[in-house]
């Protein structure tokens, strides 16, 4: 899998200081072309009080990171819970262009997924505006290191927050009682819609995939990200799966079966 666009195609070059680190503004400028907004649309079926069935359209927002490209697709990493149960998925890129995407692969145990956007659907302007993120090494993180989070907070579009590495190898129990793998803890603001977005070091490299926050009135500044060193081998496997595109109604198959209630006469006949 190769890069979607060079840094010079996507953004003006920014130079690091003598320490080899960028400012927060420089990290944002360099890396926002690698981060996308994801919208998950579905129809929820609910049984009402009288035994009938009601259908309600549902829409949720998340984030994603451009992690690769093959001959025909731009590949975007995100959280599994961002795309789970979707009827349709759309991806908004840095130039605000929106394209339909398909799930390429998911790993629910690690809350990771890859979605694919067909290059043939995309304009030249969009392709020139984006780039594949640079991958860092989350195994080398130090507590107190500054980081930048980019994501689609509250579905409003891309926003940037900054903070510090608060802890590493943090295991968290979710509301279902499931204990996560070892996560990066940061006080950079991680809000609904940030899931699947990028946690970056000050060299502009991806070090984590934002996935959760502690939500309670007495809690502040406790966000969590999947370390990229954990995520990368899983994403590599998902990226190399075959994308299964949904057929439209004109090409959808059918099994030719009609269902009937079985009465006593039918039972005796068959």
Regions found by a protein language model. Name each.
Residues 2-268:
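Serine-dependent protease modules
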